[in-house]
Regions:
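Periplasmic-binding protein-like
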Residues: 57-61, 107-118, 135-141, 182-184, ...
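Extracellular/periplasmic periplasmic-binding protein-like sensory domains
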Residues: 202-214, 261-340
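Hinge/cleft segment of the Venus flytrap/periplasmic-binding protein
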Residues: 51-53, 303-309, 315-394
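An alpha-beta-alpha
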Residues: 65-74, 157, 161-215, 335, ...
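Flexible loop/hinge segments that line or gate small-molecule binding clefts
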Residues: 128-162
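Short, well-structured alpha-helical segments in soluble
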Residues: 93-110, 127, 229-248
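Extracytoplasmic "Venus flytrap"
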Residues: 49-98, 103, 113-119, 195
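Bacterial lipoprotein signal-peptidase II cleavage site
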Residues: 13-27
Length: 394
């Protein structure tokens, strides 16, 4: 099943990148709430025991997701329901939780795939279990809550390997002969465990390679000034950094998806500006808009890379496949297999790895291990090697 272009992952504000929360609706009296939850649970169990084909997979993404039609085409409109979480998800967590609860209130919903799993995912998943919906498979993609927290609340967690990118990004910088590496982020992202792990590895590798690493704090796109302020900051700061390090090769990286178009644009016509990858590596992550490309919905990844290569080479890179989009695709495929009985376990590592490798050639799938050495057996990270666009020149 082909997935679509850049916007399909709804990354603009979230950016690669909780306690309990109330739902957005007015709470019902306790007895009524218990009765409703019992009815939903009973209906769900009845459907399961009857082997009903009325199952549904619910997909929750950000507001610019455009993948709905292809999922409906692949599985049938009766099997897929979609919704979005709000752009201002940090201040509207109740809305996110409410949407998850709404999915779980449908007894035919047997799996929820959320990507990005922004703050509110854990609280929403906990609420699903409190409703008695233990039959629902919960899959969190690209989570923004602490690994231990979201791992405990989910059946499966899927994420691009942020930490290991501290190696692959610096390897690309070394290949280019980079002198300075500029890292744009903001406090909210720098409080996220995997982003911090990547940052520390970037810093360690930069020091070993003799590359000067510069940390720059950018405006958070979820703050009051919004995404436009963050994008404008990037457009203004990149030329300043290049002027400061005049004559040196400067690589730029930002942890936020919504800043990628501005960063690509700012680097595009500057001969000493380098762009090792987007935060969520993909041929579609901002490149089509930045370069004015019309890539076909559901198009071939190699064709996309060839079109990008015709306009970019030597100073830009990304991953060969849209790993973030693939997380949703694999999540839905896995959910369908579990619901229909083709997959017996909620967490079947071998089947999951086979699914990823069948869709993303060369993917390295590992269980996440934190700084203390604790491994999470349901938290999977995905890593690909950066591409050389020269390899895609016709």
């Amino acid at each position: 099943m082909a997935l679509i272009t850049a916007a399909a992952m709804a990354m603009g504000l979230a950016g690669c990148g909780g306690g309990s929360a109330a739902t957005a609706t007015t709470a019902a009296p306790a007895e009524t709430e218990k009765t409703t939850e019992a009815a939903v649970t009973e209906a769900a169990e009845a459907a399961k025991s009857e082997g009903s084909d009325n199952w549904k997979v619910a997909i929750l993404t950000g507001t610019v997701s455009q993948g709905e039609e292809e999922f409906r085409a692949a599985y049938g409109p009766e099997h897929i329901v979609t919704a979005t979480y709000p752009d201002n998800f940090m201040s509207e967590m109740e809305t996110t939780v409410s949407q998850i609860v709404s999915f779980a209130s449908d007894p035919d919903v047997k799996a929820i795939v959320m990507c990005q799993a922004v703050p509110g995912a854990k609280a929403g998943f906990d609420k699903v279990r409190e409703m008695g919906r233990d039959d629902i498979l919960l899959i969190a993609g690209t989570p923004q809550e602490d690994p231990a927290v979201i791992s405990a609340a989910s059946d499966l967690v899927l994420y691009a390997d942020e930490a290991a990118q501290g190696d692959t990004i610096m390897e690309k910088c070394a290949e280019w002969g980079i002198d300075v590496f500029v890292h744009y982020s903001f406090p909210r992202h720098m409080a996220m465990e995997l982003i911090v792990a990547r940052h520390e590895l970037l810093k360690k590798n930069a020091e070993a390679l003799g590359i000067e690493m510069v940390d720059v704090t950018a405006p958070d796109p979820t703050a009051e000034a919004g995404l436009s302020a963050s994008q404008q900051f990037i457009l203004e700061d990149v030329p300043q950094q290049l002027k400061k390090y005049e004559g040196k090769k400067v690589a730029f990286f930002t942890t936020n998806c919504g800043m990628q178009p501005s960063l690509q644009t700012a680097c595009l016509d500057e001969p000493n500006a380098y762009y090792p990858q987007p935060c969520c590596p993909s041929p579609y992550h901002a490149f089509p808009a930045t370069l004015g490309l019309e890539l076909a919905i559901g198009g071939d990844d190699t064709e996309a890379l060839e079109q990008i290569a015709a306009k970019l080479k030597d100073r830009f890179s990304t991953w060969a496949s849209p790993v973030a989009m693939t997380i949703i695709e694999v999540g839905v495929d896995y959910a369908k297999g579990y619901i229909t009985g083709e997959i017996a376990d909620r967490n079947d590592a071998e089947t999951l790895k086979e699914m990823f490798n069948s869709k993303v050639e060369g993917a390295k799938i590992n269980n996440y291990k934190n700084a203390d050495g604790e491994e999470f057996d349901n938290y999977y990270t995905i890593l690909l090697a950066p591409v050389d666009f020269n390899d895609y020149l016709k």
